[in-house]
């Protein structure tokens, strides 16, 4: 027989059903279902002749059984064998091929596991135990967690274990890296961040400033879910009872949480929104973050809440880090309670209305157009204020657009965008250094040829409309430009300009005849308009250029 047996050849073609040791007749029936083998028992030579005949007929019909034809089509070697000897020899052949196939399978499986272990970073390159059954010779029974070794105990890139795997205890220095970095404001009071809460989108700050007469301190009151939450200005403590009422918590759970607080101050007398258990700022912020009501209570948890009341804008992170060093020293000791007059100075942009009631004078101020009653009850009145109209020049809103034009734009664009600066800078004069620098920068940026801009920096004659708004004198001193104005806007043609320069006779100074000009530029005829000193200088330079051309 040949070196390839029938089941191994079928396995090479992907047919795994014939891998078990079988008799020759059964193998022939499964390999060739078209040909029916005789199942009658007879002598071996008769079966071999029939098998050879059917194999020859099948070889004509099916082109892929050449191995089977070569194996069964040699009757000279097999004529002396009985059926039992042939079956035993074939079983030995199959057993040999089956063992060699398993011998080849397991190194491939372990190399596959090592390949996955090498591709995953920070994994230990240990051999992975492969749970392959010997009967399954295909790769469909691969374990589901093959890319992740089950016995990996390595480094910070820990992956969550699969359901079938056992979680490995992580060393303590690694477990600290796994936890998300907590917000520092909830941990220590002297943290570097002084913001505490950023402005959520679409929400304007609504704060009412009241005076707590019994405690001689100022209070900041924010309403949410028809509950007024108050924060003291002297030690930044917050009414925890009202805070948890905003979260619509039950009374038993609320009291249980507040009783477990170590630092608390119980207030039993006073107005409705002042009664309750007062807790520190950090604990209140942690509770609000846990109950997800921080955005509803904006700007109660902004650390520098006075700036929010004055400007109406949360201080940004840059200003917060700059002010952190200044406030870190004062954060250790609580500031003294400010006098009632200080309320008017701190809330500069807000309207302060005093009203007499049972508690005495209560100062209530609303910021950002809110209309919320003050601490005294029904007797106090508040006045809505538009903070944008009330801001002074010292606040960031007053000179916002002015600084935007001065600082945000680069200096090279300032001569075209900021009209208030053109009278002071010599940028509008022809041949100045800023024009040359601007054109050089444009040539460096876009890789233009320098000779393409010849004369452009000198007299700006090729692009009159580009310089018209700040330099109207060119349009009047060179009247021949206006005839081809539309063509020059679309495509500056140097040949047309050279032809016009030959035909036209420019008279130096301002043009003596009227010119059809664009609506952006007033017509400058001689004696009609008193030109500015810049126009005088430009006219003189234009006349010198005209003389040089002559």
From Swiss-Prot:
* Annotated effect of mutating residue 208 to E: Impairs chlamydospore formation but causes hyperfilamentation
User: Which positions make up the DNA-binding region?
Assistant: 240-261
Q: Where is the HTH APSES-type domain?
A: 206-312
Q: Which GO BP terms, alphabetically?
A: adhesion of symbiont to host; biological process involved in symbiotic interaction; cell adhesion; cell growth mode switching, budding to filamentous; cell migration; cell morphogenesis; cell-substrate adhesion; cellular developmental process
Alphabetical GO CC annotations of the entry are:
chromatin; nucleus
Q: Which residues carry this modification: Phosphothreonine?
A: 181, 208
Q: Which Pfam families match?
A: KilA-N (PF04383)
Top-rank lineage group of the source organism: Eukaryota
Main function: Transcriptional regulator of the switch between 2 heritable states, the white and opaque states. These 2 cell types differ in many characteristics, including cell structure, mating competence, and virulence. Each state is heritable for many generations, and switching between states occurs stochastically, at low frequency. Antagonizes the action of WOR1, WOR2 and CZF1, and promotes the white state. In white cells, EFG1 represses WOR1 indirectly through WOR2 to maintain white cell identity. Binds target gene promoters at the EFG1 recognition sequence (EGRbox) TATGCATA.
Q: How is it modified after translation?
A: Thr-208 is a phosphorylation target to promote hyphal induction by a subset of environmental cues. Phosphorylation at Thr-181 by the CDc28/HGC1 complex represses cell separation genes and leads to hyphal chain formation.
Give the protein family.
Belongs to the EFG1/PHD1/stuA family.
- Supply the alphabetized keyword list: Cell adhesion, DNA-binding, Nucleus, Phosphoprotein, Transcription, Transcription regulation, Virulence
Where are the residues of the annotated region Disordered?
17-48, 72-95, 123-182, 329-435, 476-550
Q: Where in the cell is it found?
A: Nucleus
For this entry, the protein name equals: Enhanced filamentous growth protein 1
Q: Which InterPro entries match?
A: EFG1/Phd1/StuA, HTH_APSES_sf, KilA/APSES_HTH, Tscrpt_reg_HTH_APSES-type
Q: What is its main location?
A: nucleus
Quaternary structure, from the entry = Interacts with CZF1 and FLO8.
Q: Polar residues compositional bias: what residue ranges?
A: 123-153, 384-394, 420-435, 514-544
């Amino acid at each position: 027989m040949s070196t390839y047996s029938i089941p191994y050849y079928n396995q090479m073609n992907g047919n795994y059903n014939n891998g078990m040791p079988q008799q020759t007749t059964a193998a022939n029936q499964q390999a060739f279902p078209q040909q029916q083998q005789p199942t009658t028992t007879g002598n071996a030579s008769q079966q071999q002749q029939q098998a050879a005949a059917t194999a020859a007929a099948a070889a004509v019909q099916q082109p892929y059984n050449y191995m089977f034809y070569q194996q069964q089509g040699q009757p000279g070697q097999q004529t002396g064998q009985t059926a039992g000897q042939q079956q035993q020899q074939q079983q030995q052949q199959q057993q040999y091929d089956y063992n060699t196939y398993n011998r080849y399978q397991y190194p491939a499986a372990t190399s596959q596991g090592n390949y996955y272990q090498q591709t995953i970073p920070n994994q230990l390159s240990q051999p992975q135990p492969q749970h392959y059954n010997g009967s399954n010779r295909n790769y469909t029974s691969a374990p589901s967690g093959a890319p992740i070794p089950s016995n990996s105990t390595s480094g910070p890139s820990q992956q969550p274990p699969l359901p079938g795997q056992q979680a490995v205890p992580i060393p303590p220095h690694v477990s600290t890296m796994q936890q998300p970095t907590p917000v520092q404001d909830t941990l220590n009071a002297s943290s570097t961040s002084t913001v505490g809460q950023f402005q959520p989108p679409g929400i304007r700050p609504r704060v009412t400033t009241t005076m707590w007469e019994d405690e001689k301190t100022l209070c900041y009151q924010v309403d949410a879910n028809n509950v007024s939450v108050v924060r003291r200005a002297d030690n930044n403590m917050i009414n925890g009872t009202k805070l948890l009422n905003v979260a619509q918590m039950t009374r038993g759970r609320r009291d249980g949480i507040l009783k477990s607080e170590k630092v608390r101050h119980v207030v039993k007398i006073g107005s409705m929104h002042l009664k309750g258990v007062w807790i520190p700022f950090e604990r209140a912020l942690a509770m609000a973050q846990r109950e997800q009501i921080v955005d509803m209570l904006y700007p109660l948890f902004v650390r520098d809440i006075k700036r929010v009341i004055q400007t109406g804008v949360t201080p940004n992170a840059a200003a917060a880090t700059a002010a952190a060093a200044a406030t870190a020293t004062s954060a250790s000791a609580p500031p003294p309670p400010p006098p009632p007059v200080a309320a008017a100075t701190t809330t500069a942009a807000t309207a302060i209305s005093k009203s007499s009631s049972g508690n005495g004078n209560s100062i209530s101020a609303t910021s950002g157009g809110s209309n919320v009653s003050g601490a005294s009850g029904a007797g106090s009145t508040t006045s809505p204020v538009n903070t944008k109209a009330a801001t002074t020049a010292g606040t960031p809103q007053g000179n916002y657009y002015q600084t935007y034009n001065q600082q945000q734009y680069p200096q090279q664009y300032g001569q075209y965008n900021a009209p208030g600066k053109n009278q002071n800078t010599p940028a509008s004069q022809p041949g100045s250094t800023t024009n040359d620098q601007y054109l050089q920068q444009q040539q460096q940026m876009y890789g233009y040829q320098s000779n393409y801009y010849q004369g452009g920096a000198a007299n700006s004659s090729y692009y009159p409309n580009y310089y018209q708004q700040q330099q109207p004198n060119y349009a009047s001193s060179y009247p021949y430009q206006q005839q081809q104005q539309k063509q020059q806007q679309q495509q500056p043609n140097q040949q047309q300009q050279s032809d016009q320069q030959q035909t036209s006779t420019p008279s130096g100074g301002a043009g003596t005849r009227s010119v059809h000009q664009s609506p952006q530029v007033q017509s400058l005829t001689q004696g009609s308009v008193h030109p500015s000193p810049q126009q005088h200088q430009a006219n003189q330079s234009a006349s010198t250029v005209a003389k040089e051309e002559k």
